[in-house]
């Protein structure tokens, strides 16, 4: 979260689920929906989770030690197979369009974290 605050990143893209084929693939670094966690001096609140057919969008309110507030969108792709690659690109393109729309809505061209 320190990097998110320092670079004012407003979009995070995840291509993996936390657990795939029974193995931990990604550490869960965010609070559950409606909850808030502190990471050092940074507060992260999960304000919303929306499930789409192939991905999930979370909206976080991030507040730094200096009380700077950011809205951060996290997109998590849910249809990547345990082995190989997706058979089609249509779901990835849907998520990509949603990511670009969020960037436009935020009026922000800061880095996207992948």
Swiss-Prot record:
InterPro entries: Prot-tyrosine_phosphatase-like, Protein-Tyr_Phosphatase, PTP_cat
Name of a matching Pfam family: Y_phosphatase
Reactions catalysed: O-phospho-L-tyrosyl-[protein] + H2O = L-tyrosyl-[protein] + phosphate
UniProt enzyme class: hydrolase
EC number annotated for this UniProt entry: 3.1.3.48
SMART domains the UniProt entry points to: PTPc
Annotated CDD domains: PTPc
Assigned protein family: Belongs to the protein-tyrosine phosphatase family.
Name the record gives this protein: Tyrosine-protein phosphatase 27
């Amino acid at each position: 979260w320190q990097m998110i605050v320092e670079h004012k990143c407003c979009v995070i893209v995840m291509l993996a689920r936390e657990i795939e084929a029974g193995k931990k693939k990604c550490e869960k670094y965010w609070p559950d929906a409606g909850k808030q966690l502190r990471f050092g001096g940074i507060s992260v609140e999960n304000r919303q989770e929306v499930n789409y057919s192939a991905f999930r969008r979370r909206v976080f309110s991030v507040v730094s030690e200096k009380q700077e507030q950011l809205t951060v969108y996290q997109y998590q792709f849910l249809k990547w197979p345990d082995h190989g690659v997706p058979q089609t690109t249509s779901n990835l393109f849907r998520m990509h369009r949603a990511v670009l729309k969020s960037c436009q809505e935020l009026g922000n061209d800061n880095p996207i974290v992948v």
